[in-house]
Swiss-Prot record:
Keyword Transferase: no
Name of this protein: Protein sprouty homolog 4
Protein source organism: Homo sapiens
Pfam families from the UniProt entry: Sprouty
Clinical note on disease: Hypogonadotropic hypogonadism 17 with or without anosmia: A disorder characterized by absent or incomplete sexual maturation by the age of 18 years, in conjunction with low levels of circulating gonadotropins and testosterone and no other abnormalities of the hypothalamic-pituitary axis. In some cases, it is associated with non-reproductive phenotypes, such as anosmia, cleft palate, and sensorineural hearing loss. Anosmia or hyposmia is related to the absence or hypoplasia of the olfactory bulbs and tracts.
Length: 299
């Protein structure tokens, strides 16, 4: 309750009132503040704070900020009119409902003021990066020595017996030259010339149309084979047909000549190894002035 006003003081509108002190529970530091004497007409209930609504944790002040110069810079605080200055430690009792509602409104507004971010001091903005940093290309450490040229690395498998390359390109057999004629419809080769010159193409056509579907391919492609089916029937038919077409008797000698020519051409043109069932070793390749030695590794 508010202390009674002494009767000796005149009750006039222009009279002043000394703010009452709180009970003995008030701290000694708060009692040392000087008391402010305000006229009655300047006391406004809209600026009275409610201790049960205000959040004291939101009213924490931020510390001083340091600028580039090193001098601390204090954050500016919002200035208020002297007429609106109120003490947080003053409490009143017996307030009407209108006072509490206006106090709640002012407390909410003050909470919003505290939650607003403090103004940031003007600082020099960092310069925008306009030049990209240079990329340093680090070369990996070559632990295997200098690289071997592709020509030498391709032919590093050598035969242990003859010393020639055993790669697929070098060791594959070479065939006699051939070409396609008549708009890519006829193959001109040594074996084709023998088939047409000895009339063996006629026998192949007969075997193609008269044999079973399972054996027509093998009999037509290899009419003189002894390991195919119907061997006796085929040879009997070719012997009877050779009486009418004696050129069929030249088929076997001509085919033998083609095989010999194939072997001679392959021997001259094949650069790789022609040995069978031999081991291969890794050659010692040299790149530039430095020679890279690899250990022999049989396969």
């Amino acid at each position: 309750m508010e202390p009674p006003i002494p009767q000796s003081a005149p009750l006039t509108p222009n009279s002043v009132m000394v703010q009452p002190l709180l009970d003995s529970r008030m701290s000694h530091s708060r009692l040392q503040h000087p008391l402010t004497i305000l006229p009655i007409d300047q006391v406004k209930t809209s600026h009275v704070e409610n201790d049960y609504i205000d959040n004291p944790s939101l009213a924490l002040t931020t510390g001083p900020k340091r600028t580039r110069g090193g001098a601390p810079e204090l954050a500016p605080t919002p200035a208020r009119c002297d007429q609106d200055v109120t003490h947080h430690w003053i409490s009143f009792s017996g307030r009407p409902s209108s006072v509490s509602s206006s106090s709640s409104t002012s407390s909410d507004q003050r909470l919003l003021d505290h939650m607003a971010p403090p103004p940031v001091a003007d600082q020099a903005s960092p310069r925008a990066v306009r030049i990209q940093p240079k990329v340093v290309h680090c070369q990996p450490l070559d632990l295997k020595g200098p690289a071997v040229p592709p020509e030498l690395d391709k032919h590093f498998l050598l035969c242990e017996a003859c010393g020639k390359c055993k790669c697929k390109e070098c060791a594959s057999p070479r065939t006699l030259p051939s070409c396609w004629v008549c708009n890519q419809e006829c193959l001109c080769s040594a074996q084709t010339l023998v088939n047409y010159g000895t009339c063996m193409c006629l026998v192949q056509g007969i075997f193609y149309h008269c044999t079973n579907e399972d054996d027509e391919g093998s009999c037509a492609d290899h009419p003189c084979s002894c390991s195919r089916s119907n061997c006796c029937a085929r040879w009997s038919f070719m012997g009877a047909l050779s009486v009418v077409l004696p050129c069929l008797l030249c088929y076997l000698p001509a085919t033998g000549c083609v095989k010999l020519a194939q072997r001679g051409y392959d021997r001259l043109r094949r650069p790789g190894c022609r040995c069978k069932h031999t081991n291969s070793v890794i050659c010692k390749a040299a790149s530039g002035d430095a020679k890279t030695s690899r250990p022999d590794k049989p396969f």
